[in-house]
Amino acid sequence: MTLTQLLQDKPPVRHDVQDRADIRNALSTKGQKLVVVDDDPTGTQTVHGIRVYMDWSIDTLLQALTRPDEVFYISTNSRALPPPEMRALTHELGANLLAASRKLAGETGKNVRLLLASRSDSTLRGHFPEEIDALLSGYGLEADGVILAPALFEAGRYTIDDIHWVDLGDRVVPAAETEFALDPAFGYTKSNLKEWVEEKTKGRWKAEQVLSLSLQTLRLGGVPAAFEILSQAKGGGAHRDQCGHLRGPGNSRSCLDAGGRTGETVRLPMRRLLRESSGWICG
């Protein structure tokens, strides 16, 4: 099967300039910063004009938070680490982000809302869900759900009808049928992301608990329709929101809302983003 055949019955791509403008405006006017935690150095190759930090000391993070940049990356290379070391590193990073934001508030009175994004591999390899758990724990945040959005259009990785696909040139195949799924550290057997979540979490989150944003919903209903579905995600991590075919530049993402006032944990419907498409986003 080709990508064209796979998409032939789908609605046309939705290009809503106003939606993008609203997102940028919200970041710039509401004191929000998107912090992308990147588990592999190759991830920064998909962005430009963005600062990338190689350490996450409180002083470095404080400098990053005081700059006018709306987005910055932190490169950890945690994908190359064994699980215990990854958890310690990611927990420390989350704790330092919280400490830096509190220090900024104490010294300047400025409260910054952090949108934490975890970026990982577009072929579903990485420390999922352990890395998200460690980041949340370090930051002291509970999540109502996770948005899993694996994709990297430039390399031919797409999510359509809940299935993650890899373009091999002459055809597209489910990700679990590729060599990537045989990775000795991060192997998997499921291409349906609902089932993949259950597999990777060892049943902690069941496939039937996963909500799905279809191309039809995104392209025909837009933001209001997506928000209605995402708002159903409640329960401190017991539910998960999986976004089909969502992508911006570079890999996969997950996002969490890190709270309204510095140091507070605020429960919102859409709280944490995972990391596929080479990333997750937590905010």
Residue ranges and their predicted role:
Residues 45-50, 64, 83-87, 252-253, ...:
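Short, glycine/acidic-enriched capping/hinge loops at junctions between secondary-structure elements
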Residues 24-33, 38, 61, 68-70, ...:
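Cap/lid and interdomain-hinge subdomains that line or gate substrate/regulatory clefts
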Residues 74-79, 271:
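Short loop/turn segments at strand-loop or loop-helix junctions that form parts
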Residues 51, 131-133, 254:
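Hydrophobic alpha-helical membrane context
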Residues 2-68, 154:
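N-terminal basic/disordered segments at the start of proteins
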Residues 254-283:
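Acidic, glycine-rich loop-and-beta core segments that form the ion-binding/anion-interacting portion
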Residues 43, 153-157, 274-276:
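Short gly/pro/ser/thr-enriched loop/turn and capping motifs at secondary-structure boundaries
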